[in-house]
Amino acid sequence: MNQTGSTVAINLAKKLYDAGIRDNLVLQAIANTPREMFLDAALAHKAYENTALPIGQGQTISQPYIVARMTELVMQNRPQRVLEVGTGSGYQAAILAKLVPELCTIERIKALQIQARQRLKRLDLHNVSFKYGDGWLGWPNRGPFDAIMVTAAAASLPTALLEQLSEGGRLIIPVGEDAQQLLAITRKGQEYSSEVIESVKFVPLVNGNLA
């Protein structure tokens, strides 16, 4: 594993390896990304705990294991163009931007989008396109996408996102309300195969924009 990250970030990546994450590129990206940059100063001391944390606006930064697991699932086919639905703090986007040539990310809460854009700029990540909008609708004029990652739980599968997958593309999405499951959905022509990965708990994927 690349050892250029901070000691605490490297230790987190080692813990994720012990938890079953095996993609070395994903682990390196986590080891080299300062998670504290994506949190309020009052929570910075918790940055490398394997737990979800609040980021304001009723949203959270996902626990590092889930970030790593979803990224690993996205990266199985080494995608060229990826869509992230739910930019949030920007942490997941930062991890993805280090791994794929082109990342598009959508956020419905303007304040979060502005903060995330500033953070990724400070990290010198310039292969990311940001959109303020409704994630349920995707980003049709930038697709199709080799992979789509949704970082909030949908009550049902968003049809627009399925349609924006390229042939062989994968949608990684938590689905459900009280009982949620992380699904990996692969497009084959006009058909889609679905695999249940594990049980998860995410904030809900909400329709529409929030200023």
UniProtKB/Swiss-Prot annotation:
CDD domains: AdoMet_MTases. Its EC number is 2.1.1.77. It catalyses: [protein]-L-isoaspartate + S-adenosyl-L-methionine = [protein]-L-isoaspartate alpha-methyl ester + S-adenosyl-L-homocysteine. One of its GO terms (biological process) is protein modification process. Catalyzes the methyl esterification of L-isoaspartyl residues in peptides and proteins that result from spontaneous decomposition of normal L-aspartyl and L-asparaginyl residues. It plays a role in the repair and/or degradation of damaged proteins. HAMAP family: PIMT. This is Protein-L-isoaspartate O-methyltransferase. It comes from Shewanella amazonensis (strain ATCC BAA-1098 / SB2B).
